[in-house]
Amino acid sequence: MDGGVAAMVETKPKWLTYAEMASPLPRPQLPRNIHKSTERLVFCYQFYKVRPEWWQLADEEREEGKREFLDILHTFDRHLLIRPYSTLGLKSTTDFLLWLISKEMRGVELFTAALQHSFVGRYLDRPYTYLTLTRPSIYLRHSQRRLEGEAVEEHPEQEFTGDAPYFFLYPFTKTHEWYQLPYEQRREMMLEHFRIGNQFPTVKTYTSYSIGLDDYEFVVAFEAEDPNEFQECVMRLREAKARPYTLVDTPLFTCLKRTPEELVALVF
């Protein structure tokens, strides 16, 4: 092999190999409302923590690592939807979140492999990962329903925008008793849940399903304009009739929406 060609092969970033493997994957088109859409998408919420050793590197090494990290995000964004968020100073165990949205689990696998084989990847821990699938809710059958003498829209159109400055997320699991209740009884309680949520129109909810895939049954994520309004919404939901049937709903993460460039400037 020619020496120049050999040098080019040797200097090709290993992460680029995984990006090339991801090239056949179609970039997902998000439905207007995931709670009603029949299209199944893969959601993977990956939380990362930068190791202390990163800060012992020379400035030049860190700058090169930051450029490579951005290259990975922008390259894979052709095949996945990648939403970055900062948790810096908001959660002691994490520094940032990458919300990956893919049509196939292989997209998540290849992105993770690329990041692990990058320079920055040597200095990242991933303390939390939540894998879910989207699917239509079994409790949404009609566009409207009467509840307590009031016309209630079961779930308003909640378009994915990614523009809200605040993002909240937690996994949760229902009790065994919940699944033994008659369907109509469960549905009535969920309609009350929806009615309370609808009183906070700037708080958008995305519930996805991890049953059979991960340790929890669901992951619920919220986009919000104001953390005070989100907190008020959660406090009201604590009073709902379905609340006693929640077995666990921690850990909870508070995240701030950031562009890739903003995230890199903050955490690296």
Q: Could you say what each language-model-derived stretch is?
A:
Residues G89-L90, G107, V120-R122, E159-T161:
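Short, charge-rich binding segments
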Residues L110-S118, E232-E239:
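Short amphipathic alpha-helices in soluble, non-transmembrane regions
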Residues G107-F111, H117, G121-Y128:
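Short, solvent-exposed secondary-structure capping/transition elements
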Residues G3, R187, R236-R238:
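Short, solvent-exposed amphipathic alpha-helical segments in soluble enzyme
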Residues I72-T94, G121-P136, F194-V219, C233, ...:
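Short, glycine- and small/hydrophobic-rich beta-strand elements in well-ordered beta-sheets
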Residues M1-A7:
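Short, Lys/Arg-enriched N-terminal segments with co-localized hydrophobic residues
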Residues V9-D77, K103-F111, Y130-Q199, I211, ...:
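Short S/T/G/P-rich N-terminal loop/turn motif that feeds into the first structured element of a domain
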